[in-house]
Amino acid sequence: MAPVRAAAAKRWCFTLNNYTAEEEAKVRALLPGEFHFAICGKERGEQGTPHLQGFLHFKKKQRLSALKKLLARAHWEKARGSDHDNEEYCSKENDVILTIGEPVQGNRSDLAGAVAAVKAGRRMVDIAREFSEIYVKYGRGLRDLALMIGQKPRDFKTEVVVITGPSGVGKSRLASEMEGSKFYKMKGDWWDGYSNEDIVIMDDFYGWLPFCEMLRLMDRYPHKVPVKGSYVEFTSKKIVITSNTHPESWYCPDKCYLPALFRRINKWMYWDGLRFEDVPDAMKKHPINY
């Protein structure tokens, strides 16, 4: 059976370490008529290795075999991101040796890359950063696609951290300094702007979410939260709740079974007058994390 040939593409990027004068001359001699846009810059890696970093947007599709004839020692990959993104990347050390044409605006390969990112379950904010021009033009369609095909539902226990103490001791700051992307949940039903961040922060909480909703958020099973016009999967790994009051005061014990809330709390810290410490068992009206 004949070997499968790699698919051709118009947009390629390459890295060529320890380039020779002859190889540099080949890059400088590329013919303008073959490209929509091309750029190549000189760089030095973290270990001081000199290399050429290039991006070529051909007018006709090219296979890897043809590119290897051009620069045999180079590492070639199909390009991601927009032409503008690659222009910035290849010129970041301000030593450009080749520029042909102008970056192509919003090419279809960028759109295909953004769609693939949605299908892979990437956060919309990350897609917007990587494919900024595409997002400006097709953002609504990408969001609709994400809502239609859905994020992978949660299949793990969301960690719940509670931080209590008086005003001005640094509860909000402690929450904000935790590692990971963050979404600040405001009072109200809607989660507009939620993009599956690592951490959801509920600042100055005093029971303004329905008890049954809070239990579902703190659990391990699939759950959707409402955005205007639809629902999105809740997949955050951690919920951080700051409050001036203890959890037993958040909900009415006559109407809500508070042990169900407490057992979903993984960690509870309080201000002891000097620092934040784990709450001693004697202060817990119900056991946590069981």
Curated annotation (Swiss-Prot):
Positions bound to a divalent metal cation:
E43, H51, E93
Q: Write out the residue ranges of the motif RCR-3.
A: 89-92
The record's Gene Ontology biological-process terms are: DNA replication
- Name of the protein described by the UniProt record: Replication-associated protein
Motif position, RCR-1: 13-16
Could you say which protein family the record assigns here?
Belongs to the nanoviruses/circoviruses replication-associated protein family.
Co-factor: note: Divalent metal cations, possibly Mg(2+) or Mn(2+).
Motif Nuclear localization signal: which ranges?
Answer: 4-13, 60-80
Question: So where's the catalytic machinery, residue-wise?
Answer: Y89
Q: Which domain of life is it from?
A: Viruses
- Name the residues that bind ATP: G165, P166, S167, G168, V169, G170, K171, S172
Q: Where is this motif: RCR-2?
A: 51-53
Annotated coiled-coil segments of the chain: none
Q: Which residue ranges does the record assign to the CRESS-DNA virus Rep endonuclease domain?
A: 6-103
Which keywords does this chain's UniProt record carry?
Answer: ATP-binding, Covalent protein-DNA linkage, DNA replication, DNA-binding, Endonuclease, Helicase, Host nucleus, Hydrolase, Metal-binding, Multifunctional enzyme, Nuclease, Nucleotide-binding, Nucleotidyltransferase, Transferase
Which GO terms label this protein's molecular function in UniProt?
Answer: ATP binding; ATP hydrolysis activity; DNA binding; endonuclease activity; metal ion binding; nucleotidyltransferase activity; RNA binding; RNA helicase activity
InterPro entries referenced in this protein's UniProt entry, alphabetically = CRESS_DNA_REP, Helicase_SF3_ssDNA/RNA_vir, P-loop_NTPase
Task: Quote the catalytic activity from the record.
Answer: ATP + H2O = ADP + phosphate + H(+)
Role according to the record: Essential for the replication of viral ssDNA. The closed circular ssDNA genome is first converted to a superhelical dsDNA. Rep and/or Rep' binds a specific hairpin at the genome origin of replication. Introduces an endonucleolytic nick within the conserved sequence 5'-AGTATTAC-3' in the intergenic region of the genome, thereby initiating the rolling circle replication (RCR). Following cleavage, binds covalently to the 5'-phosphate of DNA as a tyrosyl ester. The cleavage gives rise to a free 3'-OH that serves as a primer for the cellular DNA polymerase.
Quaternary assembly: Interacts with the capsid protein; this interaction relocates Rep into the nucleus.
